[in-house]
Amino acid sequence: MYKRQAMGYQKLGVAFCGGLKEEGRIACEIFRAHGFTVVSAICKAGGVPKEQVGLGEEDKVHPGQFEPMCNPIAQAMLLNEQQTEFNIVIGLCVGHDSLFYKYAQAPTTTLVTKDRALAHNPAGALYCAHSYFKDKV
């Protein structure tokens, strides 16, 4: 945060996964409390139905209900339209994060890497490589 202030950035973009919306909300609050203007975009931006890309009801988390697919390119485009100066990713899926980086015009960093098995702390597996995970890796 202090590095971004030192670099003169005022307008931050936050691209986050819907599964980490609370974490995204808290991060945005913290950035605003430190004087940044914050624009955010959730992963389901654009509301494109999964059926539009050929997925069926059996592919949905909640069959029978409207379920938009993740759209990291739309997230990037929304933040581009808002002319963010620096973007922060919170929990985008592997692959989705790469698409976001590709299409975002502002420099981007990742604050939280999605890893539900390790409470979004993938380094935890490395810390435990010689103990708990020794026989699992």
Protein language model regions, located:
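Conserved acidic residues
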Residues: Q10, E85-F86
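C-terminal functional extensions of proteins
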Residues: T109-V137
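Generic beta-sheet signal
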Residues: A41, I90, L111-K114
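Short, structured coil segments at secondary-structure junctions
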Residues: H34, Y103-P107
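Short, small-residue-biased leader/transition segments that mark boundaries at the very start
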Residues: M1-Y2
